[in-house]
Design a protein with these regions (language model features):
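N-terminal strand-loop element at the rim of the active site
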Residues: 41-97, 101-104, 109, 116-126, ...
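Short hydrophobic beta-strand element within catalytic cores of glycosyltransferases
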Residues: 163, 444, 453-456, 466
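Aromatic "clamp/platform" in nucleotide-sugar-dependent glycosyltransferases that forms part
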Residues: 417, 436
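Conserved acidic donor-binding segment of nucleotide-sugar-dependent glycosyltransferases
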Residues: 467-469, 473-480, 489-495
Length: 537
């Protein structure tokens, strides 16, 4: 064995391309999840993308993705037309196709079983609705879950449940206080089946034999589908509405297996293979669920819907678009003048200083380092401008160091999370977003509702949130220079800013009312007209 390892080490050093070609098919059979990661790395040669995939390769599994510093020199920039690149890409493609085939068989086998004998789909006759999401942490999707629950309650629905994968800790309950007084029961996903397989678990009504069969049929990375099935069986809902890819796949498959009459899956961005927590089973899971007669697929932007359809090879129109909805009563610009002044005073920001800001998670896909690069270029021409970055995340300290290295560390304020993000946004003169990938960002809508013009990278559905040249700018390509030019253009045109404040507030109120989002959601639940009937009661 030591001789084999020595030969392998020499091969990796002297012939790395050949070593990679050998390694991928070997990993496919012995460590398929790691092979999937390595395969993607072989296909990606852009600098930022390569660093992302290297970070996951180090961990050995996509589920344990890490954020790493963007250190130069980790990946050699081989040309896309080189023989080595083409050979490695071909090997990568074989690995990906193998995994797709593997998971396709898993889902086909699971959904082909006649589960009625265990779970009895005829018992799903109540009115309960279960929404499933990871947490109620400080994210845009989480905020929309809360808005949906509040809207359903206002429309007359009382049998509401929220199933969170994790609800412990303050950060994971960031929006929970908004549901106080709302007729919704919040619970956390069971950690396992416990004694359900032998008739225990504290609920004699649960079909324990079926849960055990389901769990035993699934590979290790999908066994928690049985946990979703257990918790959903305890409620026997008429509707399961899952949010975000991980929950869509696992809660969706669990709901399909146990016979929930209506399953709605809300995708909230572009395809999951653009994000660190992507899992190799997701594509085939979505394909299997798309063919299920009780499943309705949603996205919150046209760009996101079309991206999923292309990724999955599905016909145009398979994904319906239900845009985010907002209660604009809490986003009146006139009501935020005093809180905005108080916010600036609390952070020591002069009321006279132009303030460019953002609300973001300090993570790779939000590109906070690019945000700082834009700020540095703006400050070169406008030394009076201050900068504000609201939020937290794994790259926060690196972002702070980068700002200091750019010479603007004393002009960027990073206070962490703010409960009252609306007052923070209202204190800004311009909102800047530099994301690499996005769905339909809540913050862009909220900023415009408060009369704050926006500059954003043109990705996903960002351009759908604004009127180009009237309420802000969606910029492409995503260079710091182009983004800085858009920012400076707005800062240097006071009449334009005044007109944009009014136009932006009016535009988002017409396009993103909560009533329209609820109507689309209830159409997905019941079909046309249900929202109107409830509203007229």
């Amino acid at each position: 064995m030591s001789a084999v390892r020595l030969l392998w080490a020499q091969m990796k050093r002297r012939a790395p391309r050949l070593a990679n070609l050998i390694r991928i098919p070997v990993l496919v059979f012995f460590r398929p999840r790691r092979a999937y990661t390595r395969a993607h790395l072989a296909c990606v040669r852009a600098y930022d993308e390569s660093i992302r995939w290297i970070s996951r390769l180090i961990e050995g599994a996509l589920a344990h993705a890490v954020e790493v510093q963007r250190t130069r020199g980790l990946v050699r920039g081989d040309g896309g037309n080189s023989v080595g690149y083409r050979l490695e890409a071909a090997a990568a493609s074989l690995g990906i196709r193998y995994l797709d085939k593997r998971y396709r068989h898993v889902f086909q086998d699971t959904l082909s079983v006649q589960w009625d004998r265990w779970f009895g789909s005829e018992h799903f006759s109540g009115e309960s609705i279960v929404l499933a999401i990871g947490t109620l942490g400080p994210g845009g999707s989480e905020r929309q879950v809360v808005t949906t629950l509040l809207g359903l309650a206002a429309a007359g629905y009382r049998d509401l449940y929220l199933l969170c994968t994790y609800s412990g800790g303050q950060a994971s309950r960031f929006y929970a206080h908004l549901l106080e007084g709302c007729p919704v029961t919040i619970s956390e996903l069971s950690a396992g089946l416990g004694d359900a397989h032998d008739g225990g678990g504290g609920d004699e009504a649960l079909p324990c034999g079926g849960l055990k069969v389901l769990r035993d049929k699934l590979p290790d990375d999908l066994k928690d589908i049985a946990c979703f099935a257990r918790d959903l069986l305890a409620r026997r809902p008429r509707i399961v509405h899952a949010w975000l890819d991980w929950n869509n796949v696992k809660a969706g498959l669990a709901a399909a297996v146990i016979g929930v009459p209506r399953i709605v899956l809300s995708t909230r961005s572009i395809t999951p293979d653009n994000f660190p927590l992507f899992q190799p089973y997701m594509r085939e899971a979505y394909r299997a669920l798309a063919e299920h007669p009780t499943v309705c697929l949603l996205n919150n932007s046209e760009a996101g819907a079309r991206a999923y359809e292309q990724w999955l090879g599905l016909p145009h129109g398979t994904f319906n678009v239900v845009r985010n909805g907002f209660d604009f009563s809490s986003l009146e610009p006139a009501n935020k003048v005093a809180p905005a002044r108080e916010f600036r005073a609390r952070l020591g920001i002069s009321h006279e200083a132009p303030l460019i800001g953002s609300v973001l998670r300090f993570s790779e896909e939000k590109r906070p380092l690019l945000w700082v690069d834009v700020a540095a270029r703006v400050s070169e021409r406008r030394p009076d401008v201050m900068f504000l970055m609201i939020g937290d995340g794994p790259l926060r300290e690196e972002t702070r160091r980068h700002a200091e290295a750019c010479g603007i560390g004393d002009r960027i304020v990073m206070p962490g999370y703010e409960k009252d993000s609306a007052s923070a946004i209202a204190a800004m003169d311009l909102f800047l977003l530099t994301s690499r990938v996005e769905g339909l960002p809540n913050v862009l809508v909220e900023a415009q509702a408060l009369g704050v013009p926006v500059v954003t990278t043109h990705v996903g559905g960002t351009a759908e949130t604004l009127v180009q040249g009237e309420t802000g700018y969606a910029v492409f390509p995503h260079s710091a220079d182009l983004l800085a030019n858009a920012v400076l253009k707005i800062l240097g045109n006071a009449p334009w800013r005044q007109a944009a404040r009014k136009a932006a507030s009016q535009f988002v109120r017409e396009r993103f009312p909560v009533s329209r989002m609820l109507e689309g959601t209830l159409d997905a639940y019941f079909g046309g007209g249900e929202f109107a009937k409830r509203r007229d009661r």
